Structures are given as structure tokens and as C-alpha cells.
Amino acid sequence: MSRVGKAPIALPKGAEVNFAGGLLTVKGPLGTLTQAIHNLVKVVIDNGTITFSPADESREANALQGTMRALVANMVKGVTTGFERKLTLVGVGYRASLQGAALKLQLGFSHDVIHEMPEGVKAETPTQTEIIIKGSDKQKVGQVAAEVRGYRPPEPYKGKGVRYANERVILKETKKK
């Protein structure tokens, strides 16, 4: 059995869970998220906890138990506290600003890059070189952060580009004659 899957999920105050028709819905102060639960995994909701168990003894069922538990735990955390990713812009003239709900990036191209935010994800720019992406869906927040970073990933010689706040860029040495 999966060690991750065995641990029950404690529901914090303000979070409601509903399981019907193979869909698990989590409601909280930051929104509602829904996840389809695989038929090889059984879900039991009681006394403010969610417990997962494999439907049979196959390896696939054991693997899916841990996966489903991790996905639902992220949903519970997302609708109660939310997720955020911080990005920093490193480079002369690199700036970020909000244009309505969209993120406007000046990354050294001849044009500005405008990134539309998907539903449920918000961006903040506390300074011109910092971007904070927030949302209740961990997958969406990470995807948007990866897309923004992908416009100008850190280059290996000077480190200029868009990077995650905790990312260490290993710089290469330039060629010497």
C-alpha cells in the first residue's frame, strides 16, 4: 500500500467535501475545485477527514491511491489557503506590470509580451521586477508560472531572464583565448 495514500486528510474549518458519481468536490473560502476519482480507489468521508483505500490489491490501485490522495490534499489546501509562485525578472529594462487582468512583460523583445490569465489565477506585481501568481488550483498556478518563465528563461552566461524566486541559475564561464 502507498504510504502517502494511507494518511487521512484532515478538513480545515470552512472546507466542505462532497463525493458523488465519481467526482469529488471541495468547496472553501477561495472557491470550488472538482476532481474525478479513479474507480480503483475508494473514498470515505467521515468526521472531518477523507480516507482513501485501493479497491483491489493490484499495483495500479495502490499507485492510484497515493496519487488521488495527493491531488485531493492539494485541492483542500488550495480552497482554504491557496497557492502562489513568485517570479523575478533579471536584466536591464526587464519589467512586469498588470494591464487589467493580463500580465504585460517587457523582456527585451521589440514588442511587449501580454499573457492572459486563465480563470481562477491572478497575478500581482509588487515591484517592476517581481511577479506573484496566485490561485486555488496548484496545477494552473504552476502552469502559468512555467509559461511566463518560458517567454525568457534564464540564460547561462549572465543569468538574465525570468526565473522562479527560489531558483539558482548556474552560470557558465565564458570562453577564454
UniProtKB/Swiss-Prot annotation:
GO terms for molecular function: rRNA binding; structural constituent of ribosome. GO terms for cellular component: cytosolic large ribosomal subunit. Keywords: Ribonucleoprotein, Ribosomal protein, RNA-binding, rRNA-binding. InterPro entries: Ribosomal_uL6-like, Ribosomal_uL6-like_a/b-dom_sf, Ribosomal_uL6_a/b-dom, Ribosomal_uL6_bac-type, Ribosomal_uL6_CS. SUPFAM superfamilies: Ribosomal protein L6. Part of the 50S ribosomal subunit. Belongs to the universal ribosomal protein uL6 family. This protein binds to the 23S rRNA, and is important in its secondary structure. It is located near the subunit interface in the base of the L7/L12 stalk, and near the tRNA binding site of the peptidyltransferase center. NCBIfam families: L6_bact (TIGR03654). This is Large ribosomal subunit protein uL6. It comes from Ralstonia nicotianae (strain ATCC BAA-1114 / GMI1000) (Ralstonia solanacearum). The gene is rplF.
